A protein has these predicted regions:
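Active-site phosphate-binding strand-loop segment of PLP-dependent enzymes
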Residues: 15-20, 24-84, 88, 109
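Conserved active-site segment immediately N-terminal to the catalytic lysine
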Residues: 76-77, 83, 87, 94-111, ...
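Proline-centered turn/helix-capping motifs that create local helix->coil transitions or kinks
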Residues: 9-16, 61, 128-131
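Alpha-helical structural signal in soluble globular domains
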Residues: 6-10, 39, 64-75, 93, ...
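Residues at alpha-helix caps and immediate loop-helix transition turns in enzyme cores, especially N-
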Residues: 3, 32, 61-64, 90, ...
Length: 186
């Protein structure tokens, strides 16, 4: 929530006006999917981004990311998911659902340990190298990276948003965890 609030403030908006939160109905613990879809529809004229978690970490509720994606995009909004509690826990089909982007950590259900690397997904329909971004050497086109020429030429996709590389030991822990997932056919 702090990231959203400060991002909205950075762009000169009041978080109380710009952020729409969907909460459970009185006396309930889970958010009904119909309430999420209704909130998207009711705010479609002023919504640029729908950002939701894949799983509510308090209740374990798995959200219907496919229908949320469809509703958000029908309203003309981009849609992204925080998959901190979904990655490594449930099957994800981000590309097939058409989600615009997602991010996740690997230290929880992917068992990579504290401080482990994270992940990001950007749907290929959003691979626009002209988008403004903070640029780093690891996001630069691999074919010409070592020429060190002026002007940033990003790699397509999520790779083009990389700034630098994590420590190698983080990769090692993550690889070991992924090998276990592979053995389990997950």
């Amino acid at each position: 929530q702090y990231t959203f609030e400060t991002h909205v403030k950075h762009h000169g908006f009041d978080p109380n006006d710009a952020i729409v939160e969907v909460t459970p109905r009185e006396g309930e613990h889970c958010i009904r999917n119909e309430d999420i879809l209704n909130a998207i529809q009711e705010n479609s004229d002023s919504t640029a981004l729908v950002l939701f978690s894949g799983i509510n970490y308090y209740t374990g509720q798995l959200f219907d990311m496919a229908s949320i994606t469809k509703a958000a995009q029908s309203a003309g909004a981009k849609v992204g998911f925080d998959l901190a509690h979904a990655a490594g826990n449930v099957e994800l089909q981000l590309h097939d659902w058409g989600a615009d982007f997602a991010c996740w950590c690997t230290y929880k259900y992917m068992n990579s340990g504290p401080g482990a690397i994270g992940g990001v997904f950007i749907h290929e329909k959003n691979h626009n190298n002209e988008l403004p971004r903070f640029a780093g050497w690891w996001g630069y086109d691999k074919a010409t990276r070592f020429k060190m020429e002026k002007g940033f030429i990003p790699m397509p996709g999520a790779e083009g948003w990389q700034l630098s590389t994590p420590a190698l030991f983080l990769y090692a822990a993550h690889r070991a965890a992924l090998e276990i997932f592979e053995e389990a056919h997950f």
